[in-house]
Amino acid sequence: MIDWHIPTLHDFEAAQKAAEISHSMINDEAFSTIFLYRKKFGIMIAFRDGLMFRLYELEPENFYYTLPLGLDYSDSSMENLERLKDAVAALKSDADANRRRFKFILITDDKKALLEQAFPLRFTFTENPDFSDYVYNAQSMANLAGKKLQKKRNHVSHFMKTYSDVRFELINEHNTADALKIEDQWFSENNGEF
């Protein structure tokens, strides 16, 4: 059985180490993202055999597992494949014990390749654009030009009307305390949700 818990700041070092071993580059595997979105996405984590497992409850009783951090997904050695097989077996046992559908989320190309090598023809993969990282062109974001960014323009316009005395400042040693005060106020007003 996997001992799941809600991520806490005490998990940072172990999570960071696991992400480094996996050469993780996706936003969803950064501990800051895991920690900040733990409530919104019902994220639970567990550590076992040097690996960090994640479980998402995106909707009530709709769970998704992730492949663990702490494996090098570019390493197709027998030892690494065996560790992956053991990890997947542990996740499958957890799903069975808790009567959850056994399904994964956030499978990158390197993870997919190693998973297919370890479990030929065992899994079906479906791309879901709703779960994809997105990248904006810096020029587009700076100008908010075009129909695609209309909602963002409206949001900025509403913000500027609501907070007419807003100004942009780089955060430095002279205004760090003010920035933290504003962050604390915002955090309190939003019930601790980012």
Name each region found by the language model.
Residues 2-8, 19:
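Long, contiguous, compositionally biased segments that the model treats as domain-scale units
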Residues 8, 12, 152-153:
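A structural signal for well-ordered alpha-helical scaffolds and beta->alpha junctions
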Residues 87-88, 117-121:
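Short acidic (Asp/Glu) patches
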Residues 12-38:
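Intrinsically disordered, low-complexity, positively charged segments
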Residues 23, 27, 96-100, 167, ...:
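Residue-level signal for secondary-structure boundary elements
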Residues 28-110:
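Conserved donor-binding loop and adjoining core beta-sheet/short helix segment
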Residues 119-193:
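Acyltransferase donor/substrate-recognition loop-hinge adjacent to the catalytic core
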